[in-house]
Amino acid sequence: MDLDLLDLNPRIIAAIKKAKLKSVKEVLHFSGPDLKRLTNLSSPEVWHLLRTASLHLRGSSILTALQLHQQKERFPTQHQRLSLGCPVLDALLRGGLPLDGITELAGRSSAGKTQLALQLCLAVQFPRQHGGLEAGAVYICTEDAFPHKRLQQLMAQQPRLRTDVPGELLQKLRFGSQIFIEHVADVDTLLECVNKKVPVLLSRGMARLVVIDSVAAPFRCEFDSQASAPRARHLQSLGATLRELSSAFQSPVLCINQVTEAMEEQGAAHGPLGFWDERVSPALGITWANQLLVRLLADRLREEEAALGCPARTLRVLSAPHLPPSSCSYTISAEGVRGTPGTQSH
């Protein structure tokens, strides 16, 4: 019994045992007034008991935040990431997607959001030493049909994309049988899916990645500008459920989002082109933004801008508690999504 290890007056220890409290942790489950009533100890004695119990569980060492960060082996899940399948993109995100929390990937049409989501569905199936989680993925479609042909192409091209993985291991992986696809058409069906179907797959260890493509589509279809309150409630419910699932099963959640565009006239003082400049921002507003851990933006330039020599596609870190605002360019080929070396900027 660890109660005997506490540096307390034997009379206090006896009072604790008489109250049928069996451990230090059990003592800390009660408030001061409750302990006073259970043990018949005085207020100073109860305060001393709680302080001693707290110090006993905490231990004597005091660690700084830097020391905690450096001792990764003591907190493995806090530092583990899901690789994106590309060393350049992983470097941008310091290893990949965090396991606990929602990552949003917003961007224009044809920016490559779905391509990256499919690549993650394959990456999650690799062993941990190769950046995966040794499990499958749940892919929830809310807009278009699932891109089966593109997935088959990516599966066939894995040996060319993942040159870091031995060929015999690639041959053993059965990528297609580890991706569980759901199609939902409205908000209620989406909420039912994440509340009932997704937890079953996660709890059985069949999946460790949840993808929603896209989160904005059902909300934009069902709720107009006059229905902001019910939309906010449903967004909060969805976000809370996804965060709870991610935390409980240490499974990253990737939500693809649409963007809104604001037009600004760009003159000579603002740039060399003299046309209307589009400023994009993720859809769904502040209610949804508050549910997120990481917010990424996949940006695809227009032909006029790309003609000036700018990178055609850029992945930006808009916000994250562990990442600075940064970006890198990337390309999409038959093999998948690759970051361009030497293009990362802060």
UniProtKB/Swiss-Prot annotation:
What protein am I looking at?
Answer: DNA repair protein XRCC3
Per UniProt, ATP binds at 107-114
Give the induction text: Stress-induced increase in the mitochondrial levels is seen.
- Where does the protein end up? Nucleus; Cytoplasm; Cytoplasm, Perinuclear region; Mitochondrion
Gene Ontology cellular-component terms for this entry are: chromosome, telomeric region; cytoplasm; cytosol; mitochondrion; nucleoplasm; nucleus; perinuclear region of cytoplasm; Rad51C-XRCC3 complex
Q: Which domain of life is it from?
A: Eukaryota
Keyword Acyltransferase part of the UniProt annotation? no
Source organism of the structure = Homo sapiens
Name the gene that codes for it: XRCC3
- Tell me which Gene Ontology terms the entry assigns under biological process: DNA damage response; DNA recombination; DNA repair; double-strand break repair via homologous recombination; double-strand break repair via synthesis-dependent strand annealing; interstrand cross-link repair; positive regulation of mitotic cell cycle spindle assembly checkpoint; regulation of centrosome duplication
Subunit structure, interactors included: Interacts with RAD51C and RAD51. Part of the CX3 complex consisting of RAD51C and XRCC3; the complex has a ring-like structure arranged into a flat disk around a central channel; CX3 can interact with RAD51 in vitro. Forms a complex with FANCD2, BRCA2 and phosphorylated FANCG. Interacts with SWSAP1 and ZSWIM7; involved in homologous recombination repair. Interacts directly with PALB2 which may serve as a scaffold for a HR complex containing PALB2, BRCA2, RAD51C, RAD51 and XRCC3.
Disease linkage:
Breast cancer: A common malignancy originating from breast epithelial tissue. Breast neoplasms can be distinguished by their histologic pattern. Invasive ductal carcinoma is by far the most common type. Breast cancer is etiologically and genetically heterogeneous. Important genetic factors have been indicated by familial occurrence and bilateral involvement. Mutations at more than one locus can be involved in different families or even in the same case. Melanoma, cutaneous malignant 6: A malignant neoplasm of melanocytes, arising de novo or from a pre-existing benign nevus, which occurs most often in the skin but may also involve other sites.
Q: Which Pfam families match?
A: Rad51
Query: Where does it mainly reside?
Result: nucleus
Q: Does DNA damage appear among the keywords? A: yes
